[in-house]
Every structure is written in C-alpha cells, then in structure tokens.
Amino acid sequence: MKFFKYVLALHLILFSTFAQAQEKEKQMTREERADKVYEELFAAKRSGSPTDPEFMEILQRLIFGEVFYVGELSPQDRELITVVSLTTMQTLPQLKAHINAALNVGNTPLQVRESIYLAAPFIGFPRTLNAVGVFNEVIKERGINLPLENMATITEENRFEKGLALQKELYGDEVKQAMQALPEPYQTEVSDMLTKFCFSDFYTRNGLTLQQKELLSLVILTTLGAEKQIPAHIIGNLKAGNDKNRQLAAMVQAIPYIGLPNALATINLIKETKIENYKPIYE
C-alpha cells in the first residue's frame, strides 16, 4: 500500500511540474521562446545577422518562437520533418545545420540517415546522394565512424513480397489496377517498380517506425507540390496511425521552409480527404 501511495505521489509531483512548465511557456514572449528553442536545437545562443538583422529576427521568431509551439509533435519529429523538407529542396547549407539540430534534440544518427534515405523514391537518387553527403560530413565532424549499421530487413528472394505486403496494408492494389490499361511489359513493370523501389527497398528498412515514414513521405510530397499523390498519402497516414491533427501539425512545421502555397494545399486536402470518400488517384 505504501508503495502505491509513493507512486501516486510521484505521478502527482511530475504532473504538477509538467503543468507548471507548460504554463510558464505560455507566458513567455515570442522572443523568449525563440531563445529557448534555438539553444536546444543548435547548442548556442541566438544571434542576429550583421547584414539583415530584421529579416533574421522575423525568421527566428516565427520558426522557433511560434511554429515550434503549434501542434503535438516532439522536437525529434519536428527536426526530421525539417530535414526531409530541406533534402527535397536541396538547400544543403541549411540542411547541415538541421542535421546537427536533429541530433542535438535526441534523434539517433540512424534515424536521421533513414529519413534522408526515405526521400529517394520521391526525389531520385542524385538529390538524395547530395543530402547523404552532407549527413556524412556532419557524422564525421562528430567523430562517429562510418558506415553506420545496416538497416535492411529483406533479401533478394523476399524483396517483392515484403514490399507488397506493406503497400497493400496502406494503399491496397490501387496502382496495380490503374496500370492494367498499359501495354506489356509496362502494365506490370510500372506497378512492380513502385512496389520494389518505394516499399521494398525503403519502407521495409528499420530505423524509423511506419508512422514516421508515412508522415515524412507526406511532407516530401507536399514540398514537391505533388498534389495528385497527396490524398492517397493522407489515407496512408491515417492507416499508419497519424491522425489529422498530427498531419496538420507537420504541415505547419514545414511552412517556414517550403512556403505557404504547398503547405496550404495539403492542409486543405487533409481537411477534405476521408477514408470513406477517397477516390483512387490513378483511374
């Protein structure tokens, strides 16, 4: 009985401390919030720009003092969202800073690497390799040996089978059915290529949860402005455990990096798309 009373008291203390911290954050100014988040991300005090101080202040207060406080996302997930956005856009100097930030807030090197790898089916190998090069540079600067641990879970023999199982779980056989109108060999090669390249080679890998992979894929497609594919991935996110609040939070997190138009387009689609009214994108 004493033990349970002790545990209950401990929980009450922790809850009270957490509530006090939340209340304190609510009372902070945007500048104070920006200072706090910036130091957590970059392990340095926030500083201005000697050439464009006003612009830098707008940027920092919006991203670190405002956007970071919208929605229920962990700092780890926020930085992975930023990493895949910057990878997709090939903004490599900023990518390097945010790879460091992603590691500083508690992501493992493997989680960051796998987030970058995940972009390959969407943006192609050349741009992904550019981002991998930046990642490896950061890892070397931190004194971590390369290569990192292998995360593959498939063999050549079960590659297609494993990828197809994941694809069907989230998306059914929509693409396969849509490609039936193509002449051979394309009616099978195109749909099989999608299965093997995206789901077999990358979705089956360890390092990230399926829930994380789906959310990051939605961010990548939004960054690309691939509106046709986005409704299917909204449904995929719902099936993977990312409710609409989580998807909306990811879009808000991406706004300062990818801009308002693409993010707002996906936000509108999240609002409208439901499992019961979803229509296949390829018909």
Regions found by a protein language model. Give the residues of each.
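Positively charged n-region of N-terminal signal peptides that target proteins for export
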Residues: 1-6
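Bacterial N-terminal signal peptides
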Residues: 7-16
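Sec/Tat signal peptide C-region and signal peptidase I cleavage site
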Residues: 17-21
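Acidic, glycine/proline-rich low-complexity segments that act as flexible tails and inter-domain linkers
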Residues: 22-76, 128-210, 232, 239, ...
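Alpha-helical bundle segments that constitute or directly flank the non-heme di-iron/ferroxidase center
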Residues: 70, 83-91, 223-224
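Extended intrinsically disordered, low-complexity coil regions enriched in Ser, Thr, Gly, Ala
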Residues: 74-75, 90-113, 117, 126-140, ...
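Short, structured motif recognition centered on aromatic/hydrophobic residues
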Residues: 77-86, 115-116, 212-221, 250-254
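Short, glycine/charged-rich beta-strand-loop motifs at protein surfaces that mediate ligand recognition
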Residues: 206, 219-224, 237
